[in-house]
Amino acid sequence: MDPQSAVYSLPRVPTAAPPNAGVPWSHVGEVAVLSFVALICIYLLYLWVLRDLILVLKARRGRSTEELIFGSEAVDRRSPIPNTLEPTAPVHPGPFVPGSG
């Protein structure tokens, strides 16, 4: 066998595939998992800490926590609602007698 024919009789070995220019999928998966965990942590932080902190800060500004309404329907304490249901005659309750009823 001469050297010229030996080249053609050797098995062909495929060359390595060219490297991808994109990001490997394992890196994309890591970023997705870390983003999901961070989102859950922020949500739990809001549930356990930030929501109560917002209520405390609003209560310190002069409102009780029962009056807190978020948005445009907030209570205006400068003009209180007048009491229109004043009694026409004085009410004098009778003495309390136990067992009478």
Swiss-Prot record:
Keywords: Host membrane, Membrane, Transmembrane, Transmembrane helix, Transport, Viral movement protein
Cellular component terms (Gene Ontology): host cell membrane; membrane
Residue ranges, annotated region (Disordered): 78-101
Short name of any one Pfam family annotated for the protein: Gemini_mov
Source domain of life: Viruses
Membrane topology type: Single-pass membrane protein
Major location category of this protein: host cell
GO terms for biological process, alphabetical: transport of virus in host, cell to cell
Membrane-spanning ranges: 30-50
UniProt feature, compositional bias: Pro residues: 90-101
Coiled coil: none
InterPro entries to which the protein is assigned, alphabetical: Gemini_mov
Location of the protein in the cell: Host membrane
Keyword Endoplasmic reticulum: no
Subunit structure of this chain's protein: Interacts with the capsid protein (CP). Part of a MP-CP-viral DNA complex.
Protein function: Involved in the viral transport within, and between cells.
Family per record: Belongs to the mastrevirus movement protein family.
Protein name: Movement protein
High-level lineage: Viruses, Monodnaviria, Shotokuvirae, Cressdnaviricota, Repensiviricetes
